């Protein structure tokens, strides 16, 4: 550290000379030159704060000017806040003795981390699980059936051949709407029938349509009675084949008669 004699007393300001004299009276003879500036800044800040507090106390007491009592009160309040000394040793020993008289919580006897009880730790969960059980609705016994709307059914007649017949092409468009009850409703579903197996004659086949009548019954809320009225085209195909066979038989009989006539 450098000595305070480096700066000439005549070249220093009056406030700096006063601060150097205070340090000399306190027995501080060796210090850096910037210590003077720091002490001056601290003194200026402390004096202005004390005067501001004294002015506030004077205005609160409804005084015209700031007197010495206001300054003493401001210094006392500021000293209690800024310049606090540590408590005496006897006071600290008394507090420590009272604190040590409280026994520590018991350690858990079982294995695991040797921690105090849960109420003294921060390891317990701080949340609760909420169950998501849904209440049964009052309309659980009601059964609803979706509305079924069937569009037009189209089928193209195909010419039968001697081989395996080709099934007719068809397209059915269905739409499912909102769930409704079938009680008191009646509707008809048209279903195309499968074509009869191999037909030996080349007869134009007509596509027959089966009519399925669905009529909800009032027997029970969960029972639906379905009555069907189906017209099959197999009978027509069988009749056509039988007529063709009879025609062939008649032709054979005519040929036999001609042969007998020639023999005669």
Curated annotation (Swiss-Prot):
Residues 154-164 have a biased composition (Low complexity). Coiled coil: none annotated. Signal peptide: none annotated. The modification Phosphothreonine is found at residues 159, 161, 164, 178. The keyword Acetylation applies. Residues 250-264 have a biased composition (Acidic residues). The TFIID basal transcription factor complex plays a major role in the initiation of RNA polymerase II (Pol II)-dependent transcription. TFIID recognizes and binds promoters with or without a TATA box via its subunit TBP, a TATA-box-binding protein, and promotes assembly of the pre-initiation complex (PIC). The TFIID complex consists of TBP and TBP-associated factors (TAFs), including TAF1, TAF2, TAF3, TAF4, TAF5, TAF6, TAF7, TAF8, TAF9, TAF10, TAF11, TAF12 and TAF13. This is Transcription initiation factor TFIID subunit 9. It comes from Bos taurus. The lineage of its organism: Eukaryota, Metazoa, Chordata, Craniata, Vertebrata. The gene is TAF9.
